[in-house]
Design a protein with these regions (language model features):
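Short, well-ordered alpha-helical packing segments
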Residues: 48, 52, 56, 63, ...
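Domain-exit/linker segments immediately C-terminal to small folded modules
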Residues: 94-167
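Histidine-centered nuclease catalytic patch
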Residues: 64-99, 108-115
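Short, charged surface segments at domain edges that flank catalytic/cofactor-binding sites
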Residues: 1-67, 90-92, 138-159
C-alpha cells in the first residue's frame, strides 16, 4: 500500500467501503430466509450469496438459473468454483471464484474455462462469456471476465501478479 499514490489509496478505500456495504446487504438478505444458520450467517454463506448475486443467480457454464435451495439447501446443486484452478494459480480470492452447477464444475476439472470450452464447444464458450458480461455491475465484472477468457498460458501471469501482491 505504501507504493500507491494518495489517489490510488482513496480509490481502494472506496472499493472496500462498497464491498462492506454489499456484505451487509447480503447478511440482511440471508436473515430473511427461514434457515436457522442464517440468524448469524457464516462468512462462507455471505460469500456464496454475494457470488450468486454477482452472477444474477445464473451458472456461467450452463447458463441455467439457480435458487437459494440450490446453493444453501440440504443437498446443494451449486458449488463455489475456482475460475482458474486453485492448484494452478494459488488464488483463493473472491475474484477467482464463481458459483457453478456441480456437474459443470466436475466436467471443467482442473482447466480454465477457455481450455475447457474454447476448442470443444465454441457456442457454449460464447454463451458463457455473454453470461459473465451480464454479471451485476456493482462487482468487478471486467476482472472476472478476464479470468473466464484467459488464454492457455495466462494462469502463469496471474500467479506472478498474485505473488507480487503478497510481497
Amino acid at each position: 500500500d505504501l507504493k500507491k499514490s494518495k489517489k490510488e489509496r482513496q480509490k481502494q478505500t472506496e472499493i472496500n467501503r462498497d464491498r462492506e456495504k454489499l456484505r451487509q446487504e447480503a447478511t440482511g438478505e440471508l436473515r430473511k430466509h427461514d434457515v436457522v444458520r442464517f440468524a448469524n450467517p457464516r462468512n462462507s454463506d455471505i460469500e456464496k450469496y454475494l457470488l450468486a448475486t454477482e452472477a444474477r443467480w445464473q451458472c456461467p457454464y450452463t447458463s441455467k438459473k439457480y435458487g437459494v435451495t440450490d446453493v444453501f439447501g440440504d443437498h446443494p446443486q451449486v458449488d463455489v468454483e475456482h475460475i482458474i484452478p486453485r492448484s494452478r494459480s494459488l488464488d483463493d480470492s473472491y475474484l477467482n471464484k464463481t458459483l457453478a452447477y456441480r456437474s459443470a464444475n466436475m466436467e471443467k476439472g482442473n482447466r480454465t474455462p477457455r481450455e475447457w470450452l474454447f476448442e470443444s464447444d465454441q457456442e457454449q464458450y460464447d454463451r458463457m462469456i455473454g453470461v459473465v458480461s451480464g454479471f451485476d455491475p456493482r462487482f468487478e465484472v471486467g476482472k472476472k471476465l478476464r479470468r473466464f477468457s484467459m488464454e492457455l498460458s495466462d494462469p502463469d501471469s496471474l500467479l506472478k501478479e498474485f505473488t507480487e501482491r503478497q510481497l
